[in-house]
Design a protein with these regions (language model features):
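Short, acidic, small-residue-rich periplasmic hinge/interaction motif at the N-terminus
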Residues: 17-60, 99
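Extracytoplasmic beta-strand/coil segments of soluble accessory domains associated
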Residues: 68-110
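N-terminal periplasmic accessory domains that precede
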Residues: 34, 67-70, 90-93, 105, ...
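Conserved small/polar residues in nucleotide/adenosyl-binding loops
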Residues: 315-321
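Transmembrane beta-barrel wall of Gram-negative outer-membrane proteins
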Residues: 166-168, 172-204, 209-246, 282-285, ...
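Short acidic/polar hinge/loop motifs at secondary-structure boundaries
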Residues: 110-138, 157, 263
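Outer-membrane beta-barrel translocator/channel fold
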Residues: 235-271, 275
Length: 322
């Protein structure tokens, strides 16, 4: 079991351009976003290549596949899927840089693994359903995480507070017995400024590759408090993946004759004859995240923001060779 605690404290100043016409009086209205990620986001005049993706654009493709697969149509992006169906273990490369050089942040907090700096999207199934918007920066970007963002940056912002209450039930069915069920709700913003929302998801798939099955569960719970000067956002989210291992690959001869062959779990007798496959050659992994964001507007030109993050990881493996 592994625990990771992150503290992020920032203070941002907004310069106000003086008007040449001093006879004109303008009333400035400043609206704070649900979570301030301005330090990580590129603007129109920022000298870098980037793409902004809205919630509406994500929803058009969000039928159960992992987030990297939803971004596969963006320039310079190549995605992979161990199971071949876009569900389970997936990866992303941007301009040739692998996932260890693609910095991922959720509400401004780094999501990449602290040791390998890889990103395991399988541990956040259906997370796209709780993303309000994202920005992909190609090449060295604005990330505050230094060299980790050498190849690219993916900045995710989770759902904003919904003004109206709602309840949603969504299901999708696809090839290879792929099935996704999602339940979402929101209480709407109350008169006192509070809002609570959540999501439960379940995704299952047999995969294109032999025995590359996935059984994924996820949750997302969020509470917000909004006033003119104060924004508080507390959320917890996580996932549980049970996936049959399918990352070993095959030689060119096997690929030509049987593209879907999966050598994981092979069992041989004393003479070297293949007897079958181990049924429980799976990854059993849980990942939970808790975030707290507080933002206080000090004046029209300054605001103070605080971010806290707690991560809990639990991995269980019962592979045949262990």
């Amino acid at each position: 079991m592994k625990y990771i605690i992150t503290l992020m404290l920032g203070c941002s100043l907004m310069a106000q351009q003086a008007k040449s016409d001093i006879d004109t009086l303008t009333v400035n209205t400043v609206t704070l976003e649900s979570v301030t990620v301005s330090a990580l986001r590129a603007k129109e005049n920022t000298p870098m290549a980037f793409t902004n993706i809205s919630k509406e654009e994500l929803e058009k493709q969000n039928l159960g596949k992992d987030l990297p697969v939803l971004l596969r149509f963006l320039p310079n992006v190549v995605t992979t899927s161990d199971a071949g169906a876009g569900v389970g273990y997936t990866g992303i490369r941007v301009r040739g840089s692998d996932a260890t050089r693609v910095n991922v942040t959720i509400n401004g907090i780094a999501y990449n693994d602290a040791e390998s700096h890889n990103t395991f999207w399988v541990d956040l199934p259906d997370f796209a359903s709780s993303v309000d918007n994202l920005q992909l920066q190609r090449g060295v970007g604005t990330s505050t995480n230094g060299a980790a963002a050498f190849g690219a940056s993916i900045n995710l912002e989770t759902d904003k507070a919904s003004e109206k209450s709602y309840a949603q039930l969504a299901s999708s069915v696809g090839s290879f017995s792929t099935l996704k069920n999602t339940i979402k709700f929101s209480t709407g913003i109350s008169e006192s400024g509070f809002e609570f929302s959540g999501r439960l998801s379940n995704i299952s798939s047999d995969g294109y590759v032999d025995r590359a099955s996935s059984n994924l569960k996820a949750y997302f719970l969020q509470g917000t408090y909004n006033t003119n000067n104060t924004k508080i956002k507390a959320l917890t989210f996580g996932g549980h993946e049970l996936t049959y291992q399918a990352w070993y690959g095959v030689d060119p001869a096997t690929l030509a004759s049987k593209r879907t062959y999966n050598p994981a779990g092979e069992q041989y007798d004393e003479d070297g004859n293949l007897q079958g496959y181990y049924d429980n050659q799976v990854d059993n992994y849980k990942q939970d995240h808790t975030q707290l964001h507080i933002e206080q507007r000090l004046s029209n030109n300054a605001r103070l923001s605080l971010g806290l993050n707690y991560t809990c990881l639990l991995y269980t493996s019962d592979a045949a060779d262990e």
